[in-house]
């Protein structure tokens, strides 16, 4: 629990986390928790920054308060897998890393011919520890609207203060900045991929970037 309470606010914990009864343990809602927790109570030499990590892991979420048509199917589920990225960096570099991280997600989706846009969260929509957050949204031809497929956040030194992640260098000792980004969550990516590459006859066009991994196939044809 010392990691969980350090990486997120109480409101987020209540809405997301599954606690194991009788244990001081939680199921992770994102591998950000495990990766940031790696640096708990550490002093990092400034010349070893940035620290960049990525992880593909199972994720578990209660999704309290979720409702509506999007909650059916694979859009919002209690167990899924996700590729996450985190950065621990110098305070003056966090803005640069923030822009670089969300751009990774945008580039990935656009490489698969999925239209995406970014939406900067207003201050009232930010979780307590976040300095800035951007949602990456993909176009849904079925719903005729964009829906969230990823999120990138700059936590400033908020997580670092809670978890005692410090930097030492010529400027003395100070708190690092931390950031996280959802590269891809396969369930939502699959929705966006199928809807934007589906042909009228039920076949699915394979984007060029994926063809080398599909034996050179250009189209997936349904079995009748």
Regions found by a protein language model. Name each.
Residues 1-224:
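TRNA-recognition modules of translation machinery and tRNA-sensing kinases, especially anticodon-binding
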